[in-house]
Every structure is written in structure tokens, then in C-alpha cells.
Amino acid sequence: MNQHLRFATLSKYPPYRSGHAKQALWNNTALAVLTGVEQRQVTYCGVSSDPEDDAGARVQVHHVTEVRGNRRVPDGHLLRAVAAKLYRVVLENDVDVINTYYIDPHAAIANRVADALALVGRRPIVINSIEGSDVLESVCEHLTDGSAAPLFGDVMRGDVLCTVSHYTAQRFLAGAEAIGGARLADTIAESIVLRYPGLPSAAYAQPGDADLREFRHKHGLRQDSILISTLGRLEEEKGLDTLLAIADIAAATRPELEFVIAGTGSLGDRLVEQAQQVPNLTVLRNVSTHDAQCLRAATEVGVFPTKIIPGFIETFCVAALEYEALGVPVLASAIGGVPEATPDDRFLVEPGTSAAEWLARIEEVLANRAGRGAVATAYAGKFTSARSAQRLIDLATLAADRLDRQSPLKLDPLDEYLTTWPARLPLVTGTAEPAPM
């Protein structure tokens, strides 16, 4: 196969407007360095004019800007427009690999485009990746109504089937068993490969002391306080009510602590209002990339009390990994794929833990801050975008070299790519878990 592989990554949002689309950009930037050629990203939910949204010189972003309807066909226009854009991008730029973020609906689009390109002798490798909402919103919560079933056919038509975490693979296989029994689950299990997210080199760059002082001054934070923070979407599933309660308790017992909740989301207005009643809590909305990095670096403990709600469970936790990359220990809920983003159980808190117990855990981390920080740094160092991109190159090359491309690539069972805590067990199927209530 061509040594200078060209990828076209299909993501819903532009690379600067969602976590997974940003991860796609990180991978594409690393792919450009590793291959020496420009990489491409196809997206269909908006174009931004924010200067921080620039994808960089090595990644070309192609936006679906026009969706033409057909009065005789009432639905499906957007998916057809995305497929048409992806087809043109692949054909006109000699793309070798289509890589998807989320299988729903991207696997079907990628397969459709690959089949069409095969008619003109240009079929690319298709790498389908199972991500967050694929697990619950597309599969586990739609087993009984039947809408999950076609997704299993979609993923098995690709050349490579990736999951963002071992937990994601297990839940997906449980859904497969519920629909098609152990035989279907075992067939898919043979083809699932892990490809963890990877952070760009900028994520490991420590801001200077002057930058940290300016950051604190700019946002009204005390220069001598001990910062406890979280950064991510301001949504119900992030468990931010727990952090509010922790800050409220600490206001009376640990005056040296200051708490920061940062990010964007639908709870922003409510959180700002609630923070007015908690003197040691600051809510920062729409922070810049620079300020986000300063917040992480200035923090003593990152806190992620994420929880399960209908339609959502963390299938990894890149936000925690970004803190760890700067040597900041974290405490995160032990749910879903979160344990795979943390070094060991000292960094995890069981679901249902009270705010007072969370605060006690924070105090325990502070008492061992240097050691925990060193562990966090070493662990996060495994998760680079270069390593994730190299994984894509290796998988695409192996898939292209097969004589039989009628089913997805099957890796050697001894594949030891990025084995993490907890110890990675063979992908065995079990009873499908009920949807969370």
C-alpha cells in the first residue's frame, strides 16, 4: 500500500466544535506529520469564523454547505449530501482511507461511498470507529425497537472496526448478543480492535509562571489559593451538582481551596447563578484554548464526577487525560470507560459517593500530590496523537494487504496495543445491560 497514506475523516462537527471532532483533528495533524501529506476532514454541522478554529496548514476541512431536497423523497437529503461530499473529496484527492468518528450514521455513509468508488476502481479502506453515543443512544437503548440491528451490518461491511475503549467494545458486543445471539457477538468480537484517543504535543506543554499569574488575575482567582477544577461540557451528565456541593462544604471547612467549573453547555446560566451563592466557586464560560491550558496547569486536583443518564455514559474521558498530561492528578467517577483514562483506582471514586466523601478524597490526593502527579504524567504520556495516528496507519496497511476483504480485519489475539488499567481481558460476550434509567 502507498506509504504516504491520505485519510479522509468523517465527523459530524467541525474539528473545533466537539470533543470527538477535535480528536479527529489531532489525529489528522499527527497523520500529516507521519505520512508527509495533507490530510482531510469532512464535516456537515456548521462553519466557524473564530480564529481559534483554524485547523492548521496540514489538514483541509471540507464542509457540506448545501443540502438539496427532492420533493418526491421526503427524507435522507443530508446523508446523501454528506456522501456526495465525501465521494468527491476521496476521488479528487487520491484518498486511501475513510476514517469515521461514530458509526451512526457514518458507517453507512462510508460504506456507500466506498462501494460507489469501487465502481470506478478507487475503493478506499474503510475504518469505522465506535464512539460515545454509539453505545447507548444508537444500540443499547434501541435493542427492543429494532433500530440498533442495522448498525451491526454497517460495521461488518467496513475493513476495520475500532472502539474508543475496551468498555465500549464490551457494551457493543452485549448489544450484538441481544440481537443476534452469541454467534453474532463472537463474530464481531474477532474483528474489534482498540484505538484509544491521543493528545497533541500542545496538551503536554506547561504554561509559564507569568501566564498562570495572569490567568488567576484575569478571572478573579486568588494568587495563593489551591485550585480544584473541572473543564468540559456544562451538561447534566457531567455531575456538576456534585462539585457545587463539594465547594459549598469546603467554603466553611477549607478556606484555602478555590473551585472552578469551566466549559460550555446548556447549564451555563444556571451554574453562574448558583455560583453567586458559593463564595469559593467561579464558573468560566467559553474559555480560550490558552486559558483552558492555564486552568489545568494551575489546578492541584481535577475533578470529574460524571454520571449515567439516559442516552449517555462516558466511554473514555479525554478531559481527565488532558489534566494528567500536565501532571495534575484527577478524581473521576468509576463508570463506563473512565477507568481506562486513569492510572489506577486511586484516581477513581465510586458512583453514589457523597460530596463530603469527595472532599475527603480530594484532601487525600492533596496530601500525596507530588506522587500522584508523577503517576498521572507517566500514564498520560502513553496517549499521544502520534501513537493513535500510527495505530490508524498500521490498521489501514494490514487491512489493505489482506487477500480476502469480504469481512473486517482480524488482529492477532496477542495484540498488546496500549494495554491499560484495568488489565485488558479477552472480549467475551455477556448479557446485555439494561438501559440506565
Residue ranges and their predicted role:
Residues 297-312, 328:
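Acidic donor-binding loop of glycosyltransferase active sites
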